[in-house]
Every structure is written in structure tokens, then in C-alpha cells.
Amino acid sequence: MDLSETALAEAVGAARQAFARAGDLDALARLKTEHLGDRAPLALARQALGGVPKDQRADAGKRVNAARAQAQQAYDERLAELRAERDAAVLVAERIDVTLPSTRQPVGARHPITILAEHIADTFIAMGWELAEGPEVEAEQFNFDALNFPADHPARSEQDTFYIAPEGSRQLLRTHTSPVQVRTLLARELPVYVISIGRTFRTDELDATHTPVFHQVEGLAVDRGLSMAHLRGTLDAFARAEFGPQARTRIRPHFFPFTEPSAEVDVWFVGKKGGAGWVEWGGCGMVHPNVLRAAGIDPDVYSGFAFGMGLERTLQFRNGIPDMRDMVEGDMRFSLPFGVGA
């Protein structure tokens, strides 16, 4: 192997010319192997140093190392140039013309159940009521026992209620928001005027008029001297807020374990799609004395009323929605008409 300065200079010159001709990074990588790899002339020159006489080996080594450094520098410079060209091309390709009209992003919509729940809350807060909350995983004591449900009441069966494992834990997914009544009476000073809005769970099949997970609004008032007249006035105000100023209510005798007397509420209103008439809306009544006693309240001193309505049902008949499944499928096309980005 010729280790003269002339031979090494020729090898360096060949490498420089080759690197300069490289049109892209892939081509440069191939040329690097050819001129700086283990079988390249400069690599073979380094291997040949072993055959050089000892008194000449140091000078020869310096020449070989200098030549290789020059070739490496030529490679590094061309590599930097090609990378700069690539980055510039990417910037041009991805350049954004800020003068062009922007691409409009789709606007989301809040779910109509959320909108209805917040409107109901605002209505009662304006009347001086407060909001109350309770857990969705509830104790059987609050869901049934404290609400005067007898031990053999059919609502306690697994055909109607989701119980939490293990068996015998007496924990369940609340079947109504009425447990908030008891928790509120135990936790707050009287008088009490609260509403609770939240999810409830029953073993219903999802169809056009039923869903296993639905929302309820529960109203509770306990004070001295409350009567059915106060309940009727509250229901009428609630109905007008949700169904329009012409709406009115009527009540029909019914039975609920936690109220006495109990009634079902019908509402008359003009529908959003035309037509007017009476529709069953929910349940109501005077708080049962046993419920007051369970909360440590003397029913001879205090009385109260309660009412409860389903939000999905309210939305369905108020807005003429034929299929309740539309409310749970998450299709934004269903939610948009109720309030874009509301």
C-alpha cells in the first residue's frame, strides 16, 4: 500500500469529489462506506502501517491520520449541507399561508340532559332552594329502609335493583334520588329546601321508552306548617319554568312508601312540535312521618313535601323525542339542536 503524501492526497481528493456529488443523504451514506469504511483506501493505509520500518512509522502514521481527518471533514461538511437542504424543503412543504381562510373546527354541543339539569337547578336556586348531592353507590339503609320501604317490597328484588358484590354487602346502585332526602335531613339544620339531580339505576332494558341509567330531579322541603298547597305552588312554578307560561299541573292519588298522602303529577303544556295536552310527569306527596322520624325529626312539629321527575322522560315528551335511545348514543347531531356550545 502506497503511503506517500501523493497517494494519500489522491485518496482524500477522490473522497471529497465523491461526497460533493452526493445528491441526498442516502447517497452520502453509501459513499461514506466506500471512502471511510473498513475496506476504504484510507482504512487500508492505516492497516499497512504495520509493514513500515519503525523509524518511518511515526511520520507515516501522522500522514495517514491527517488524510483520514481531511476526508472525514469533507464528509461532515457535505452531511451538514444536505441536512440543511432537507430541512429547508420540509419547511417549504409544510409552510402555512396565514392569509388563507382558516379551516373551521367542528363546534361541539352540550348534552341536552346536562342543559336541562342546569336549567332546573337555576330555576330552584332562583326560588331560594339549595342543591344537595348523594352517592350513586348507596347503602340499602338509605335507599329503602329509611324511606319506609317494607322488607318484602318488590323494588328490593334483584329483578329491579343492581346490588353490589359481595352478596350481603347491602350496597347497591341507587334506584332513585330519594336517599338524598334522608342524608340531607340528617346533615342539615331545619328548615330544608333542597333539590338533588343525579343518575339512578334500574334493571330496565334499553328501548324507546326505558334506559337502565337515567337521571332524576328530587325536591325536598321540610319546615313548620308546610302543606299540599305549598307543594302544588312549587310544582306549578316548576312546570311553567320548563314547559312555558301556559303550563299547569294536576295531581292524582297514588302510593309511595316515603310520602303520605302521595300523588302522581300530570302537566299540561303546549308541545314544542305543536299540540297540547296532559302528560304524566312524576310523583310527589307529603313526606311520610316515618321518614321524618328516621332522621330524628318530630312529625308533630315539622312537615314536608317531596317530588321527583325523570329528566329523560321530561325531555322526551317536552321535545317530542320518539326514541330514548337517541339520548344515550352520543351522536352530536342529536345534541346540536338543543344548544350549540351552550
UniProtKB/Swiss-Prot annotation:
This is Phenylalanine--tRNA ligase alpha subunit. It comes from Mycobacterium avium (strain 104). GO terms for molecular function: ATP binding; magnesium ion binding; phenylalanine-tRNA ligase activity; tRNA binding. It is found in: Cytoplasm. The gene is pheS. One of its GO terms (cellular component) is cytoplasm. Keywords: Aminoacyl-tRNA synthetase, ATP-binding, Cytoplasm, Ligase, Magnesium, Metal-binding, Nucleotide-binding, Protein biosynthesis. Binds 2 magnesium ions per tetramer. InterPro entries: aa-tRNA-synth_II (IPR006195), aa-tRNA-synth_II/BPL/LPL (IPR045864), Phe-tRNA-synth_IIc_asu (IPR004529), Phe-tRNA_ligase_II_N (IPR004188), Phe_tRNA_ligase_alpha1_bac (IPR022911), Phenylalanyl-tRNA_Synthase (IPR002319), tRNA-bd_arm (IPR010978). The keyword Protein biosynthesis applies. The keyword Transcription regulation does not apply. The lineage of its organism: Bacteria, Bacillati, Actinomycetota, Actinomycetes, Mycobacteriales. It catalyses: tRNA(Phe) + L-phenylalanine + ATP = L-phenylalanyl-tRNA(Phe) + AMP + diphosphate + H(+). Belongs to the class-II aminoacyl-tRNA synthetase family. Phe-tRNA synthetase alpha subunit type 1 subfamily.
